[in-house]
Each structure stands twice: as C-alpha cells, then as structure tokens.
Amino acid sequence: MQYLLIVKKALGMLEKLRQAAREMRVAVVKMTTAAGSGHPGGSLGIADVFAALYLGGVLKFKPGDARWKGRDYFVLSNGHLNPAWYAALAQAKCIPERELTTLRQLGSRLQGHPVRGTLPQVEVSTGSLGQGIGVAVGIALGMKMERLPNRVYCSMGDGELEEGSCWEAFAAASHYKLDNLTIFIDRNGLQQNGRTEGIMTLEPLAERLSSFGLNVINADGHDFTQILAAFKKARATKGKPSAIIFKTTMGKGVSFMQAKHEWHGKALSQTQAAEALKELAQ
C-alpha cells in the first residue's frame, strides 16, 4: 500500500509539471505576441526545465519573500529566455499571472532581459551572453566563504558557450570546488543565425566541460523524470560544480516552430499565435 501511495504521488507530480509547462508555453506565446517582440523559440524549449526547477521541489524559495535569506539563487545567464522565466514565476505564485501581459512595456517590471531593481527575484541584470555565469560563480563562492547552505543555479544557452568568459567562469568554479553550483545548459543546437555547430563547434561538449573539472550530467530536457533526476544528482555531487546538458527542442509544442532557428528572436503574428495556441491546447 505504501509503495502504491508513493507511485501515485510521483505520477501526480509529473502530471502537475506537464500541466504547468503547457500553461507556461501558452503564456510565452501570448506575451511575446502581445509585445510584438521577444524570444519565443528558446522559451518554449526550456519550459519543462523551468517548470521542474520551480515546481518540482528543486529550487528553494518563498513566493511571498523573494529576498528570503535561505533561498537558493537563480541566475538567468541566457537572459533572452525571460518569457519562460516570467511564466515560471507566475506558475510558482511569485508574480501575478495578469502581469505577464505587460512584457516589454515601458515601465513594466517584466523587461525583455532581467533588470535588477525591477522584479525582486532578479539577482543580477543579464542578457549580454557569458556574463551571468561569472556572477553565479561569484555568488556560489561567497556562499562557500560564509559557510552558508544556499545553492546557486545558473541557466545558460548552448550558443552562449561561444563566449570565452563562460569557460573562465567554469575554470574558476572548478578551482574553488563549488559543489553548491549547478549550471544547466539549454542544448537545442540552434542560435540566432543557424546551427551552433555551423557557427562555432561545441562538441564534444560533455568532454570539454569535464576537462574543465565539472561534473557533467546528460538529460532529456523534455522528460520530467530525467530532469528531476539530473538536478538530484547534481545536488548530491561533492567537491566539484555540476553542469547539466539538457537536450531540448527550440519551439517545443508548436509544430511550425520546432527546431527552427528563425524563431530564436521573432514574435508570432496574430494568425500564427492562434494556430500555436490551438496546438498547445491539444
């Protein structure tokens, strides 16, 4: 009986995450279409990972107290995926869902990239690729020096890894044995102008990260069981930082957007949005 209850609870969690990710994708389409700009492709692709991070018991936070001292720190180094992050914050009751409609509006707290001083959940302004990871390493080092239990999570894009500053940060994280740092990479193989491998070769990515002293974990970024297991494994790792490579699909959930780099930073038309929302409702 106890086993059946555990299984039922686990299945309930997975369904909760699937529903949340679906609603996040709907929000991404609606808010970027209303704004007429933004980055819907990658946001649709990372939705499952963000849902697991915020609703799967991975990230420690208090919805009503964004500056809680016991919180885990989250840095969105690939800051253009803000639509997905805002949608996750709404699902986690950190911000009102109605506020999502203000994306990129003058005076809105929800700017196109994270801006410190707008939302209290923004730990650092990001968007210039390759910079957020350095700050995340600094926060993790500070936690270590103060002997604090807080963990640091840093979201990165695979195209972002073309920036040399990322690798300097990885080297420092390894040098200081920052096992309180979990880096996760959105490996969709695409960036603004095409395929990552055609612009700057990243493979063998796992081996490269490992050579910098990181504990590398590979996972399907659309399989919640794998996503949660990867975060759990990273948390259990001692003596070195972890890097999770999440294999994802840009534009996930919308057939005409999937695996197409053209949707990196282009909003949908009203007609396209209606079709996308129809697919996401199925």
Spell out what each predicted region is.
Residues 20-37, 186-188:
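N-terminal capping segment at the start of a domain
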Residues 121, 125-128, 133-237:
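Thiamine diphosphate
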Residues 48, 80-81, 188-189, 223, ...:
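Glycine-rich beta-alpha junction loops
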Residues 87, 115, 165-167, 193-197, ...:
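Short acidic, glycine/serine/threonine-rich loops at helix termini
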Residues 12-13, 17:
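Positively charged, low-complexity intrinsically disordered leader regions
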Residues 1-10:
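N-terminal amphipathic/basic-hydrophobic helices that include classical n-h-c signal peptides
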